[in-house]
Amino acid sequence: MGDMANNSVVYGGVKNSLKEANHDGDFGITLAAVRALMELRSTDALRKILESYGDVYGICTKLKTSPNEGLRGNPADLERREAVFGKNFIPPKKPKTFLQLVWEALQDVTLIILEIAAIVSLGLSFYQPPEGDNALCGEVSVGEEEGEGETGWIEGAAILLSVVCVVLVTAFNDWSKEKQFRGLQSRIEQEQKFTVIRGGQVIQIPVSDITVGDIAQVKYGDLLPADGILIQGNDLKIDESSLTGESDHVKKSLDKDPLLLSGTHVMEGSGRMVVTAVGVNSQTGIIFTLLGAGGEEEEKKDEKKKEKKNKKQDGAIENRNKAKAQDGEPMEMQPLKSEEGGDGDEKDKKKANLPKKEKSVLQGKLTKLAVQIGKAGLLMSAITVIILVLYFLIDTFWVQKRPWLAECTPIYIQYFVKFFIIGVTVLVVAVPEGLPLPVTISLAYSVNEMMKDNNLVRHLDACETMGNATAICSDKTGTLTMNRMAVVQAYINEKHYKKVPEPEPYPPNILSYLVTGISVNCAYTSKILPPEEEGGLPRIVGNKTECALLGPLLDLKQDYQDVRNEIPEEALYKVYTFQSVRKSMSTVLKNSDGSFRIFSKGASEIILKKCFKILSANGEAKVFRPRDRDDIVKTVIEPMASEGLRTICLAFRDFPAGEPEPEWDNENDIVTGLTCIAVVGIEDPGRPEVADAIKKCQRAGITVEVVTGDNINTARAIATKCGILHPGEDFLCLEGKDFNRRIRNEKGEIEQESIDKIWPKLRVLARSSPTDKHTLVKGIIDSTVSEQRQVVAVTGDGTNDGPALKKADGGFAMGIAGTDVAKEASDIILTDDNFTSIVKAVMWGRNVYDSISKFLQFQLTVNVVAVIVAFTGACITQDSPLKAVQMLWVNLIMDTLASLALATEPPTESLLLGKPYGRNKPLISRTMMKNILGHAFYQLVVVFTLLLAGEKFFDIDSGRNAPLHAPPSEHYTIVFNIFVLMQLFNEINARKIHGERNVFEGIFNNAIFCTIVLGTFVVQIIIVQFAGKPFSCSELSVEQWLWSIFLGMGTLLWGQLISTIPTSRLKFQKEVVHGTQKREIGEEELAEDVEEIVHAERELRRWQILWFRGLNRIQTQIRVVNAFRSSLYEGLEKPESRSSIHNFMTHPEFRIEDSEPHIPLIDDTDAEDDAPTKRNSSPPPSPNKNNNLVDSGIHLTIEMNKSATSSSPGSPLHSLETSL
């Protein structure tokens, strides 16, 4: 280190000459030489530097840069450097072209089948049998108009055209989705900045603007954006596992290993480096180039294999690429990482497994549901074709006794092709291949909108996961507080000052220790700069806590910069950088007489324990006994902490010149025997909006826990101010040590049972390390206390928070205070570091789930009706009332347009009124099932009435049993038109899935929805009135259109009728059918009242009086139920009372088979609640998510009272009884 300081001084003389020579001649080092140098490691690199350049300063000279003042920042010079050494940009993988996306969309099996059938139909339609054989070949319409009989080709052509439309829309969707993701990626890249020195000024520039010759400042937590050589370093340790696979941190120093490589993480320390290679010429870029070239060759070789795997892997690769590219790392780096060895494998396995994680819970559920429905659809379509073929053969050759004529064979084949097309049509509608599509659309929409709410989403699935969040482990500083720190109290000079005093009271030596200790023992990157505008606040650069300590020096009329100029960073002998584990920072100075002095600062309790002396009022050091320390803790530190202040102790120690030099690597022996200078209290005011956000979380069933490194009293005070803690509540506040003592056994191993006893009541974990945070997060996730697995979100800003951020279901990194390592490990970056943004993320997550449920409710209704109509119509009339082209149009409405309309609904505050859905919540709630079956019933009645009697009602010709190639009939056109309009109006019904009556509420807030509904209606008019034969439609009169609209609007009125049917009534009837009449009539009435209260509270605030009536009735019912508790318990003890048919109905058919816990497709949980095996488990969430009281209290009371569970303190039942 001493040599380094000397080098700096020597170099100072040539600094000015370099500035002048900055643009003269070429650089003294070539790009190839730099690349060759950076490929060497440790001693080899050091030897090469010494032999070829003398030292790192020689390299600086060759690169025409100053190690102290950096580049001058001249635009022409920067451009020349980019031209010679390249730009710091690694080009991403080329996006798929629109034609490639079209080709992928064409791979859909059902579309391929339809294309083949359409081509066969098209070919055969041009064959005409001899005139005389027409009668012998069966009913083939020749038509009265000229050319009428020759229009058979139109259906085949129209099917092909429709397939082209579907393919183009699908490809456009994929293209726009990819474009959105790339926009997000570029946004994240723009957010990435790095600190460099240019023209002697420390500035932050975008990573892409860094060029060779820049002097970059590296610090704890940074992700290095380019290759470089160390100029000066303090205790610098790098994690190079991303490049080498070695898990051990590599110590960097000028005399051992000075090379710093791009894509690696700074785990400890700080320093400066000269940038030597950027972009594709850096080590990361070289690997990317190799992988990119290899990848292209592989693509050419394995194109066929890849095509088969495309569907499975596309989304995963895209998400993985996005995740990697966001961090400035090449997309193709991932395979190399996961193939390397070492402990780094575990991290990389996590990343390599990301694609599995990216296929989110919801997407997985939808895919399974689509497969199951698809199987049913395949069966239905096969049966349809078989019935049609048999019907034709029996009718033609058995009943009519026609002979098989060779010349009629093409006609018969045309019939069979027609039947086949009908079967495929049933399959096309039945198979909801677009079911996972709304997830992608909704997530993409949400991700873009969440940016406006200060949530930068890195991993798509995190958006949906947050909707299920049950616990949030939040940092205190910056998240719950404003991170605007200032020293407001101090214990110094043996006095407790409630405000920072004038400099006069201090003895000169105390002031000297204070000024020097703070100036050199804070990172030199932490500065307080003058305000940009006159009268404004000073600008704070660097660490907020350190800037808070620098502030009082200015108040004391002392200039820390003078001290730093006198003792430059290069002159610091040894630095023990701040770590969340040690919770302190220490700096060693070497004096001119050969003695050493160490300054320490850190958490007051930790530093005070290492203090053996304290500076007295007259400035002399006196003995500091344990009881003196206890007095300071009680009289100074605890009062400060109880006011929410962070307490920091400042201390020093001298090492005399005559003694042997200490072993500096043995930190424990160095940082002890200190002399206390002062204890300061730093105020970090709480964010005023956080209390309301936490209230929303609690109402939404989310537990908020503070996990901080601060003093327990400080943490408790802030938690109380924010509303996390309430006086008189039975919650835990623990310190890290106490937490570990409680959860570990004698061998020091963590016991899950012990964690399960603590976490439900834990609200504050203070003086915690990142390991404690990881342990808590893992413990909550692995907990089996509740029936549903807990979904945990965690915030983090430090490098060591990485494991906790990765382990959590939703990892939030701080955008302002967070390190690059924390950001890389996170799922979402909070660009404003504010807790309220997490609550918005929860709201968006729940909105995704609701959007998918809306789409599901809509699509399944269409599926049920279309399949039954096509199947039954084909069997009865030997033809499908809905033609293939019409079905494709319906399919387009169902899949793509409805996805866009329903998956882009903006969220509302009401989403935070219910409990989390839980990972195992069925996709289809009872309310949704009621709506699906109810609307399907209405639509089927209307369609079949029109099908069988429509011609009499409208006084038109019947379209049933029409011959082959017959012109379109008005009859079937009306059926098609009314069917589509019913779907269109039902799309409005589908906007509400919790039984709300006002389906139009907020409809105009969603411009996309309004545009799609109106657009679909206009296209339907065009199809019916002008498309004619291609869509098998005949023009309709105004009266017929009015009837169509009236019957379509009937779904809205029918929806109101369905809403009046209580879901609880349906549940009760279902239980009667299953033979489980255990529910008291009073309880059933109570459930109805609760349902009414839900609607009243949600929609008509003036009916709040119902709450009071309802609560009175609930109180009465609780007493009644309590009275019958024991008798109910006896009744439940007999498992034989459950019939085998009930077990059969409630298990296999309603479950999705998977390695995960069984997730029923339909919410059938309430029918099982009475099972003795579930007597002691908490019931699943109510389908109605918009009412907190119902979910947390009333429903639980009914079920738990029946089950004879005791209302333990802290349980939902206990809290309800207490509130009543």
UniProtKB/Swiss-Prot annotation:
Transmembrane segments: 106-126, 155-175, 367-386, 419-439, 856-876, 883-903, 928-948, 972-991, 1006-1027, 1040-1060
Listed EC numbers: 7.2.2.10
Name used for this protein in its record: Plasma membrane calcium-transporting ATPase 1
Any one Gene Ontology BP term: regulation of vascular associated smooth muscle contraction
Region Calmodulin-binding subdomain A, annotated ranges: 1100-1117
Main function: Catalyzes the hydrolysis of ATP coupled with the transport of calcium from the cytoplasm to the extracellular space thereby maintaining intracellular calcium homeostasis. Plays a role in blood pressure regulation through regulation of intracellular calcium concentration and nitric oxide production leading to regulation of vascular smooth muscle cells vasoconstriction. Positively regulates bone mineralization through absorption of calcium from the intestine.
Disordered: annotated span: 297-356, 1160-1220
Domain remark from Swiss-Prot or TrEMBL: Isoforms A and C contain and additional calmodulin-binding subdomain B which is different in the different splice variants and shows pH dependent calmodulin binding properties.
Keyword Thylakoid: no
Major subcellular site: membrane
NCBIfam families: ATPase-IIB_Ca, ATPase_P-type
UniProtKB keywords: Acetylation, ATP-binding, Calcium, Calcium transport, Calmodulin-binding, Cell membrane, Cell projection, Cytoplasmic vesicle, Ion transport, Magnesium, Membrane, Metal-binding, Nucleotide-binding, Phosphoprotein, Synapse, Translocase, Transmembrane, Transmembrane helix, Transport
PROSITE patterns recorded: ATPASE_E1_E2 (PS00154)
Assembly notes: Monomer. Dimer. Oligomer. Calmodulin binding. Interacts with PDZD11. Interacts with SLC35G1 and STIM1. Interacts with YWHAE; interacts with the monomeric and dimeric forms of the YWHAE but prefer the monomer form; this interaction inhibits calcium-transporting ATPase activity. Interacts with NPTN; this interaction stabilizes ATP2B1 and increases ATPase activity; this interaction controls T cell calcium homeostasis following T cell activation. Interacts with EPB41; regulates small intestinal calcium absorption through regulation of membrane expression of ATP2B1.
Location of Phosphothreonine modifications: T1116, T1165
Source species taxonomy: Eukaryota, Metazoa, Chordata, Craniata, Vertebrata
Reaction equations catalysed: Ca(2+)(in) + ATP + H2O = Ca(2+)(out) + ADP + phosphate + H(+)
Superkingdom: Eukaryota
Any Pfam family the entry gives: ATP_Ca_trans_C
SMART domains for this protein: Cation_ATPase_N
